[in-house]
Protein backbone atom coordinates (compact mmCIF):
# COMPACT_ATOMS: atom_id res chain seq x y z
CA UNK A 1 0.00 0.00 0.00
CA UNK A 2 1.36 3.40 -0.98
CA UNK A 3 1.60 6.41 1.34
CA UNK A 4 -1.73 7.67 -0.03
CA UNK A 5 -3.39 4.31 0.80
CA UNK A 6 -3.52 3.27 -2.85
CA UNK A 7 -3.08 -0.45 -3.31
CA UNK A 8 0.05 -1.15 -5.35
CA UNK A 9 0.26 -4.23 -7.56
CA UNK A 10 3.69 -3.75 -9.11
CA UNK A 11 5.26 -6.65 -7.18
CA UNK A 12 2.38 -8.97 -8.02
CA UNK A 13 2.56 -7.92 -11.67
CA UNK A 14 6.30 -8.60 -11.70
CA UNK A 15 5.83 -12.06 -10.22
CA UNK A 16 3.01 -12.83 -12.66
CA UNK A 17 5.03 -11.74 -15.69
CA UNK A 18 8.11 -13.64 -14.51
CA UNK A 19 5.95 -16.71 -13.99
CA UNK A 20 4.85 -16.54 -17.62
CA UNK A 21 8.45 -15.89 -18.73
CA UNK A 22 9.65 -19.01 -16.94
CA UNK A 23 6.70 -21.06 -18.14
CA UNK A 24 7.62 -20.12 -21.72
CA UNK A 25 11.20 -21.26 -21.07
CA UNK A 26 10.06 -24.61 -19.67
CA UNK A 27 7.50 -25.17 -22.44
CA UNK A 28 10.20 -24.47 -25.05
CA UNK A 29 12.66 -26.73 -23.23
CA UNK A 30 10.17 -29.59 -23.19
CA UNK A 31 9.05 -29.13 -26.79
CA UNK A 32 5.59 -27.80 -26.03
CA UNK A 33 3.56 -25.16 -27.81
CA UNK A 34 4.39 -21.67 -26.60
CA UNK A 35 0.86 -20.53 -27.49
CA UNK A 36 -0.37 -22.43 -24.43
CA UNK A 37 1.67 -20.15 -22.17
CA UNK A 38 -0.22 -17.03 -23.20
CA UNK A 39 -3.72 -18.53 -23.42
CA UNK A 40 -6.01 -20.20 -20.89
CA UNK A 41 -3.73 -23.12 -19.93
CA UNK A 42 -0.91 -20.73 -18.98
CA UNK A 43 -1.86 -17.12 -18.30
CA UNK A 44 -5.48 -17.97 -17.54
CA UNK A 45 -4.66 -20.64 -14.99
CA UNK A 46 -1.87 -18.59 -13.43
CA UNK A 47 -4.22 -15.64 -12.99
CA UNK A 48 -6.95 -17.69 -11.31
CA UNK A 49 -4.45 -19.55 -9.13
CA UNK A 50 -2.60 -16.46 -7.96
CA UNK A 51 -5.62 -14.24 -7.33
CA UNK A 52 -7.47 -16.39 -4.86
CA UNK A 53 -7.89 -19.73 -3.21
CA UNK A 54 -5.50 -21.85 -1.23
CA UNK A 55 -2.31 -20.92 -3.09
CA UNK A 56 -3.04 -17.24 -2.56
CA UNK A 57 -3.84 -17.84 1.11
CA UNK A 58 -0.52 -19.63 1.61
CA UNK A 59 1.20 -16.78 -0.21
CA UNK A 60 -0.21 -14.33 2.32
CA UNK A 61 1.30 -16.30 5.19
CA UNK A 62 4.64 -16.52 3.40
CA UNK A 63 4.53 -12.81 2.64
CA UNK A 64 4.03 -12.12 6.34
CA UNK A 65 7.29 -13.94 7.01
CA UNK A 66 5.86 -17.24 8.24
CA UNK A 67 8.07 -20.14 7.04
CA UNK A 68 6.25 -22.60 4.79
CA UNK A 69 6.40 -25.56 7.18
CA UNK A 70 4.96 -23.49 10.02
CA UNK A 71 2.25 -21.91 7.86
CA UNK A 72 1.22 -25.34 6.61
CA UNK A 73 1.25 -26.95 10.06
CA UNK A 74 -0.41 -24.13 12.00
CA UNK A 75 -2.80 -22.52 9.53
CA UNK A 76 -3.42 -24.94 6.67
CA UNK A 77 -2.73 -28.40 8.09
CA UNK A 78 -5.76 -30.07 6.55
CA UNK A 79 -5.79 -28.01 3.36
CA UNK A 80 -4.36 -29.07 0.01
CA UNK A 81 -2.15 -26.31 -1.39
CA UNK A 82 -1.62 -27.44 -4.98
CA UNK A 83 1.26 -25.09 -5.75
CA UNK A 84 3.17 -26.23 -2.68
CA UNK A 85 2.52 -29.89 -3.45
CA UNK A 86 3.81 -29.34 -6.96
CA UNK A 87 6.96 -27.63 -5.66
CA UNK A 88 7.56 -30.54 -3.28
CA UNK A 89 6.99 -33.08 -6.05
CA UNK A 90 9.22 -31.49 -8.70
CA UNK A 91 11.68 -29.59 -6.50
CA UNK A 92 14.33 -32.29 -6.12
CA UNK A 93 14.20 -33.15 -9.83
CA UNK A 94 14.42 -29.51 -10.89
CA UNK A 95 17.37 -28.93 -8.56
CA UNK A 96 19.10 -32.02 -9.97
CA UNK A 97 18.45 -30.92 -13.55
CA UNK A 98 19.89 -27.47 -12.79
CA UNK A 99 22.97 -29.10 -11.23
CA UNK A 100 23.38 -31.27 -14.35
CA UNK A 101 22.99 -28.27 -16.66
CA UNK A 102 19.73 -29.55 -18.16
CA UNK A 103 17.82 -26.51 -16.91
CA UNK A 104 19.40 -23.05 -17.03
CA UNK A 105 19.13 -21.61 -13.51
CA UNK A 106 19.25 -18.06 -14.89
CA UNK A 107 16.06 -18.80 -16.82
CA UNK A 108 14.02 -19.94 -13.80
CA UNK A 109 14.93 -17.77 -10.78
CA UNK A 110 11.32 -17.55 -9.59
CA UNK A 111 10.76 -21.30 -9.78
CA UNK A 112 14.00 -21.97 -7.90
CA UNK A 113 13.05 -19.40 -5.27
CA UNK A 114 9.62 -20.98 -4.80
CA UNK A 115 11.17 -24.43 -4.51
CA UNK A 116 13.61 -23.06 -1.93
CA UNK A 117 10.77 -21.45 0.06
CA UNK A 118 8.55 -24.55 0.03
CA UNK A 119 11.11 -27.36 0.15
CA UNK A 120 13.77 -25.74 2.32
CA UNK A 121 11.81 -23.18 4.39
CA UNK A 122 13.83 -20.33 2.91
CA UNK A 123 12.62 -16.80 3.64
CA UNK A 124 10.63 -15.03 0.94
CA UNK A 125 13.27 -12.98 -0.86
CA UNK A 126 12.71 -12.65 -4.59
CA UNK A 127 15.77 -12.12 -6.83
CA UNK A 128 14.21 -9.18 -8.69
CA UNK A 129 17.44 -8.35 -10.52
CA UNK A 130 17.50 -11.85 -12.00
CA UNK A 131 14.02 -11.59 -13.49
CA UNK A 132 13.58 -11.42 -17.28
CA UNK A 133 17.24 -12.30 -17.82
CA UNK A 134 17.05 -15.94 -18.85
CA UNK A 135 16.92 -17.74 -22.16
CA UNK A 136 13.49 -16.96 -23.57
CA UNK A 137 13.43 -16.04 -27.25
List the predicted regions and their residue ranges.
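Short, contiguous, pocket-lining structural segments
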Residues: 11-15
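NAD(P)-dependent Rossmann-like dehydrogenase/reductase catalytic/cofactor-binding core
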Residues: 3-7, 17-24, 28-137
Amino acid sequence: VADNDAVMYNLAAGLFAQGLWETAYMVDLMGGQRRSVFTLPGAGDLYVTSMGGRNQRMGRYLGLGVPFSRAKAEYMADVTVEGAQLAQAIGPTVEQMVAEGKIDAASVPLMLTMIDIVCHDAPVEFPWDAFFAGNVA
